[in-house]
Amino acid sequence: MMQKSDQPALKQIAMVLLFDRRNRLLIYLRDDKPDIPFPNHWDFFGGHVEEGETPEGALIREVKEELGVELVDWRFFRTYVCTEGDAYPNVKYIYWAKVEKAPQELVLYEGQTLRSLTLDERANIRFANVLGAILEDFIAVGLWPRPVDNLPS
């Protein structure tokens, strides 16, 4: 028999490791405002799953709101239950996807700036919350796509 818990349900967050047409990871610099968690840190695209919404629905909505891109193809990576190391306890649904665009073809609607990141550049990045560890997990299982260097920037 299931017992009712006095604990509030964990907030749900859907995020995507989004790669550009050269297979570089697209990340954005969070605003530098003292009233937001992890100001001036680099972040993945995505956000909160709203009531009645699936994680996939939230992912599509958030990427459209933040980057103006309609995600049509994505893959699930992992679920993380984050009880520490973040602004509040949450469940993160992590996906990965690719957009066939160069960074300069994209418009960032939230945050300070957009960046495309190579595998080797990640060590110098200050990621928000537990995202650095999530990225390392993604790399460890061999999912970072091979670079495509024969395309114009």
Positions of PLM-derived features:
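Conserved N-terminal beta-strand and adjoining loop/helix that marks the start
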Residues: 2-26
